[in-house]
Every structure is written in C-alpha cells, then in structure tokens.
C-alpha cells in the first residue's frame, strides 16, 4: 500500500545481494520512492528476513507471489535484480499490469540507460535496462570523450573482486560482455566497443577497478577531452560517491608510421585516451570493495528517483 502521496510504490524482485542493497538504499535515501514489496524465491534468504525486520512486505513466491500481494495494485515501478534468464517472464507479467521496470540484469529487453548520459530520453520507457556494473562505470567516460571528439574504438576492462561476484554475476558473464559492448556503442557513442571482465581472486579483496581506452583522432584536443572526463566523473560521483579517477588521464599519440595495434591486430593512427577508475562501495549492505554491485544499485536508484520526481511533479 502506498504510504505517501508524494512517493511512488516500488517492488524489488530478487532478495540477493543487489536486491537487498537496493532496498536499504531506497529506505535510507529515496525522496520519492516507497518500498511496497521485497520479492524472492528462497524463504530462508537473508534479504527477505532483513526486509521483514524493516517492515517491508515480503513474498518468497517470485513474480506470481508479487502479483498476489494485497499492495501490488499500488506498485508503479519494479526493480528486477534477478538474472537475465528470469527477466523475460518478469517483464512480460509486469508489462501486462502497467508496471514500469528497471532491469538490473543484462537481459537488455528495454533501452540501455546510464543516468548521467541518457536517462531523460527514456523516463517513460516501460522497461529500462541498467546495462552492467562495468557499463555504468565506463560508459560515462566513453561518452565524455565522444561528446568532444570522435571515438573510433573503445575498450573497457572491468576488474572486480571474486568475492563480490555471486552466482548471478558468474552465470551472466557472456551477457555482461555482449551487453556492455553494445552499450559502449549505442550509449557511449563509440563506433566500435569491446568489454572485458576480470574476476580478481586477490585477498584481501580489491575494490572495483575499471580501465577505459578510447581511440580518437590524432589531432584531438587533449585539454577538452580531459575537462570533459573530469566533469563526467563529478557527475557520476553525485550519485555514486565512491566513484573516482585513480590517476591522471593519459594520452598517447600514434602516427601512420607507427600506428596503434588493437582489436585482433587492426592498426590505426590516432590519439589513445587511457582512463583509470576506482569504485568504492557505500557499504550499505555490501562490503566497500563491492563497488561493482554498489554502482548498479546507485544507478538504479538514481533512475527511479528521477522517474518518480517527474511523475510527482506532474
């Protein structure tokens, strides 16, 4: 049941690490959202138990259990924090009931959304896909370069702690690379994109690290590129406080006589831009090294807050 006329009722599907962290973020920080349901499939999950302790209505009956809940009619937005495979049915069921979906899986049924880049283009989309953790961290940087210089090729490497990669993340590795690569192009603005994910087994666990390489024109303006990148980092940090540059932006020029070799041996002259990022989690529910999960929940919350704010204002 909706508790506040200035808030939209939301449901969170998936009571694992991502869903539980998202629930805590909404409860603590959301101005326009009210958690109406936490949905899982394991009655013994910590996420459902924690939700119940916090007074959030719960069901272990999955999507069908959600639809059967007394407060479901009030739900306007549903976050799906399950898996790409499960999302198709969830999207179909929720769509029938007119519930807008924010998809935190790599299913990519709806348009790719990175809040600082293109959220306002998709506020009314029935299904918004939040790409991947690597996408949320790196696509803003690709876009920052592409808005001041053409990006002929962009490659990102997302390195995350093995301990932060649960069964859902591990099951979706292929979807991660495919979805992120596409979004580097369609959202980031690169002519071609490539994504790589590395699960780092180091102990103690390391924070999420992301490397972004962009190949642009040889005579591109380095000062304009660096300014655009730093402005973008500040914009992302406004909703992911642990997001930061790890070191200065690096530039390397390659001439026709000494071209850059990349992506299966292709060679090209140009300016290579290298950006090194670190993402520290807020440690609401997950440990601080799990920045890869924190950036997903933070981006999803930012998207939902803006959607809700636009509806409340209307």
Swiss-Prot record:
Catalysed reaction(s)?
A: acetaldehyde + NAD(+) + CoA = acetyl-CoA + NADH + H(+)
Q: Some GO term, biological process aspect, for this entry: which one? A: catabolic process
Can you provide one Gene Ontology molecular function annotated for this UniProt record?
NAD binding
Specify the enzyme's EC class, one word.
Answer: oxidoreductase
- Keyword flag Lipoprotein: no
Among SMART domains, the record links this protein to: Semialdhyde_dh
Q: Which SUPFAM superfamilies match?
A: Glyceraldehyde-3-phosphate dehydrogenase-like, C-terminal domain (SSF55347), NAD(P)-binding Rossmann-fold domains (SSF51735)
Keywords, ordered alphabetically = Aromatic hydrocarbons catabolism, NAD, Oxidoreductase
Catalytic center at which residues?
A: 133 (acyl-thioester intermediate)
The EC number on file is 1.2.1.10
Name one matching Pfam family.
Semialdhyde_dh
Annotated InterPro entries: Acetaldehyde_dehydrogenase, Acetylaldehyde_DH_C, NAD(P)-bd_dom_sf, Semialdehyde_DH_NAD-bd
Residues involved in NAD(+) binding: 15-18, 164-172, 292
Q: Which family does it belong to?
A: Belongs to the acetaldehyde dehydrogenase family.
Q: What is this protein called?
A: Acetaldehyde dehydrogenase 4
- What broad taxonomic lineage does this protein's source fall under? Bacteria, Pseudomonadati, Pseudomonadota, Betaproteobacteria, Burkholderiales
């Amino acid at each position: 049941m909706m508790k506040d006329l200035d808030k939209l009722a939301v449901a969170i599907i998936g009571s694992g690490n991502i869903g539980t962290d998202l629930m805590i973020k909404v409860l603590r920080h959301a101005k326009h959202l009210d958690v109406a349901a936490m949905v899982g499939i394991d009655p013994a999950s910590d996420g459902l138990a924690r939700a119940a302790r916090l007074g959030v209505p719960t069901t272990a009956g999955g999507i069908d259990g959600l639809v059967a809940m007394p407060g479901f009619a009030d739900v306007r937005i549903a976050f799906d924090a399950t898996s790409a495979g499960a999302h198709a049915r969830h999207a179909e069921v929720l769509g029938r009931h007119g519930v807008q979906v924010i998809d935190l899986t790599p299913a990519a049924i709806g348009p790719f959304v990175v809040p600082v880049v293109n959220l306002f283009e998709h506020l009314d989309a029935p299904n918004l896909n939040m790409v991947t953790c690597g996408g949320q961290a790196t696509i803003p940087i690709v876009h920052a370069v592409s808005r001041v210089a053409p990006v002929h090729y962009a490659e990102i490497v997302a390195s995350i702690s093995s301990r932060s990669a649960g069964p859902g993340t591990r099951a979706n590795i292929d979807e991660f690379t495919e979805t992120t690569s596409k979004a580097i192009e369609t959202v980031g603005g690169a002519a071609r994109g490539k994504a790589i994910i590395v699960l780092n087994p180091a102990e103690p666990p390391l924070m999420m690290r992301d490397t972004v390489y962009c190949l642009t024109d040889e005579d591109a303006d380095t000062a304009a590129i660096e300014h655009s990148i730093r402005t973008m980092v500040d914009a992302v940090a406004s909703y992911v406080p642990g997001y930061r540059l790890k070191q200065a932006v690096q530039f390397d020029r390659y001439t026709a006589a000494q071209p850059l070799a990349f992506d299966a041996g292709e060679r090209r002259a140009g300016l290579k831009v290298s950006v090194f990022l670190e993402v520290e989690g807020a440690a609401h529910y997950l440990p601080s090294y799990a920045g890869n999960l924190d950036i997903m929940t933070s981006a999803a919350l930012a998207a939902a807050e803006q959607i809700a704010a636009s509806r409340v204002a209307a």
